[in-house]
Amino acid sequence: MLGDSCWVKNFGVSARTMLNKGDHPYMNEPAYKNALAFNPNIVVIKLGTNDSKSFNWKYKADFMKDAQTMINAFKGLPSQPKIYLCYPSKAYLTGDGINDDIISKEIIPMIKKLAKKNDLSVIDLHTAMDGMPELFPDRIHPNEKGAQVMAKAVYQSISALK
């Protein structure tokens, strides 16, 4: 979508949390260190879904602090990247795991505050993926078509604000 002049690198790791006290903190992953070492011009941060699990969300008081730590790390890079924060995708899962009520009523407002505080752009994947449960076979992870819809939403946000 971005063309040959852009080099897109995925440093995502499945099932990771923004919360450093979460069950699988992203900032403890080699991928996080590699993302910083890559010294990108654009950063898209999409975390929060797994933070909504009750055993992670009990540490919600740390969410904004931990997210700010990550934002500051990317802001401090020599490349001074443009940083985008994503609202987590709609979660169609029900039960004791990932909780869309927590995502929509608590995590998204926190991300919104962080974006405003840091003058960052937001990519609203929650709205972009709303009403499309058929694109999430396991009710949480998108299939190929769902990934394309998400990629298009990210692309449109990045290209609109260049």
Model-found features: residue ranges?
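Conserved SGNH/GDSL esterase-like catalytic core that processes O-acyl groups on lipids
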Residues: 1-65, 92, 102
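Helix C-cap/helix->beta junction micro-motif
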Residues: 2, 77-79, 118
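Conserved beta-strand segments of alpha/beta enzyme cores
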Residues: 7-9, 82, 119-121
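Catalytic His-Asp segment of secreted/periplasmic serine-dependent ester chemistry enzymes
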Residues: 89-162
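Glycine-rich phosphate-binding loop signature in dinucleotide/nucleotide-binding domains
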Residues: 35-39, 77-78, 161
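Active-site segments of SGNH/GDSL-like serine hydrolases
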Residues: 46-50, 73-105
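Generic structural signal for well-ordered alpha-helices
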Residues: 32, 67-71, 108
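Structural signal for conserved beta-strand scaffold positions within catalytic alpha/beta enzyme cores
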Residues: 10-12, 85, 124
